[in-house]
Amino acid sequence: MSILQKLENSAAAAVKALYGTDPMEGQIQLQKTKREFKGHLTLVVFPFVKMSRKSPEATATEIGEWLLANESAVSAIEVVKGFLNLTIAPRVWLELLNEIRADINFGHKVATEDSPLVMVEYSSPNTNKPLHLGHVRNNLLGYSLSEIMKANGYRVVKTNIVNDRGIHICKSMLAWQKWGDGVTPEKAGKKGDHLIGDFYVLFDKHYKAELNSLMAEGKSKEEAEAASTLMAEAREMLRLWEAGDEKVVDLWRTMNQWVYDGFDATYKMMGVDFDKIYYESETYLVGKEEVLRGLEEGLFVKHSDGSVWADLTKDGLDEKLLLRADGTSVYMTQDIGTAKMRFNDYPINRMIYVVGNEQNYHFQVLSILLDRLGFEFGKGLVHFSYGMVELPEGKMKSREGTVVDADDLMDEMIRTAAEIAAEAGKAAEMDEEESREVARIVGLGSLKYFILKVDPRKNMTFNPKESIDFNGNTGSFVQYTYARIRSLMRRAEAAGYDIPSQLPTDLPLSEKEEALIQKVSEYAEVVSEAGHSYSPALIANYIYDLVKEYNQFYHDFSVLKEEDERIRAFRLALSEVVALTMRKGFALLGIEMPERM
């Protein structure tokens, strides 16, 4: 039982003993005491004033005196208006530190075969271009959320839906046919996803030129788009693909495999993975079957042009297209099919979609349509909606070829980390291989931390230069502190200093040492809240606060030079626990820790 839970129970017992009634749920409010006051935890007394029929100050004093007499964990009290500040006895903090050290899974719950199963969808790339900065935020959020849910005791299936079919894929295929001259990734000397992305950009370049030519002849933009032969060819290629044309399907398979090979390399570098990958080419037919079933059952309507729609006006929305007039499907069709397949494949208790906030309407509609089709799971879908990410230069547009590729960004971060380390002389004692590995860990860690420390629901600007800074709220600052603690522990081991498995509980502690133990003990609560609110940012910012407190402690107190053997062992044990907590927290963010920097 945590100190917080223990004192919540004792406060409830105090209210019952003093005022003859049990407090209602939520009335016991314990929070961390503000720095300007004495104490560790503060009880809000206002909810009990009606019971006591006394002033807030008198009520706080009564409850505080009862706790002093009946709860040995409380060593002192201070009343400030309607707030009761409680000081916890040093013995309790040392007992807690021993408990944390003994529990290798502290802060994490271990799933069993009976634990609820959560499926988390993230990444969802198109096979017509490489992953870009927007995908980086998506992948990092999805992976981190999955790890956080695991730490909260859930069984987790990480899944990816690859958008491997559709008009956008046909644009790249058509451009390769027309202007590719048989080029392959090997011939071009580049990753397959980048090569296919080049042809997507090339299609758009020729398409715009065609539109400009048609508009120069006097056509409006709409008329030019309708008259475009290039777009007509792309649509015909899509029709042939859906009809199973052998040549088109063979080309599609070949070019998609080039892209998959490229994606795999990017995912490996990024440090994300998946338990199950679905492909739109396999799920959209299931979706079409469901839409046609809904049409037969009168759930949907067919317009005069042959297109199929869902009328959502009774749900406060508008009409939603489900099948085009030519019978081809849309994203919604595929998502219906994918959802059905997933719930057939796994006993899912919660389905979480990690998708940007521009798709809020889409998932609102998907939930309604699945429910209308008779799937009970439709009501329980969770859209983890996150904000857009940009660079200081502005927005990214893949059609114009100005997108920031994930591969290029990661390479730049690793190079920058290596350069900064070299300038600071931090890599002087390392050989070339270790220097490269540390640069990789720090560069990617800085990228991940900078993105994940931001509230996922907010838009953000990623600044590569700001993200690698050995001071301030950055991943590299945390990693440097971790490496310093590991160096401290190696020196302690070399000096033969022993740390007993159980520390004595009669040691004198300073306020800063108590506060640091308290901060470590909050890890479990933060992990729980991060899972409840789907927020990796809570983990990131907690670790940063922990690091700040540790650095202040390290600045103010001797560790290796402490002459009192028992105090030295305590401070080493505390340092070790802080480092372990940092590593566990960063692992939930997908960030590695270097042993040296």
Curated annotation (Swiss-Prot):
It is found in: Cytoplasm. One of its GO terms (molecular function) is arginine-tRNA ligase activity. PROSITE patterns: AA_TRNA_LIGASE_I. A motif ('HIGH' region) lies at residues 125-135. It comes from the Bacteria. The keyword Cytoplasm applies. Keywords: Aminoacyl-tRNA synthetase, ATP-binding, Cytoplasm, Ligase, Nucleotide-binding, Protein biosynthesis. GO terms for cellular component: cytoplasm. Its main location: cytoplasm. It is an enzyme of class 6 (ligase). InterPro entries: aa-tRNA-synth_I_CS (IPR001412), Arg-tRNA-ligase (IPR001278), Arg-tRNA-synth_N (IPR005148), Arg-tRNA-synth_N_sf (IPR036695), ArgRS_core (IPR035684), DALR_anticod-bd (IPR008909), Rossmann-like_a/b/a_fold (IPR014729), tRNAsynth_Ia_anticodon-bd (IPR009080). The keyword ATP-binding applies. Its EC number is 6.1.1.19. It catalyses: tRNA(Arg) + L-arginine + ATP = L-arginyl-tRNA(Arg) + AMP + diphosphate. One of its GO terms (biological process) is arginyl-tRNA aminoacylation. PANTHER family: ARGININE--TRNA LIGASE, CYTOPLASMIC (PTHR11956:SF5), ARGINYL-TRNA SYNTHETASE (PTHR11956). HAMAP family: Arg_tRNA_synth (MF_00123). Monomer. Belongs to the class-I aminoacyl-tRNA synthetase family. This is Arginine--tRNA ligase. It comes from Porphyromonas gingivalis (strain ATCC BAA-308 / W83). The gene is argS.
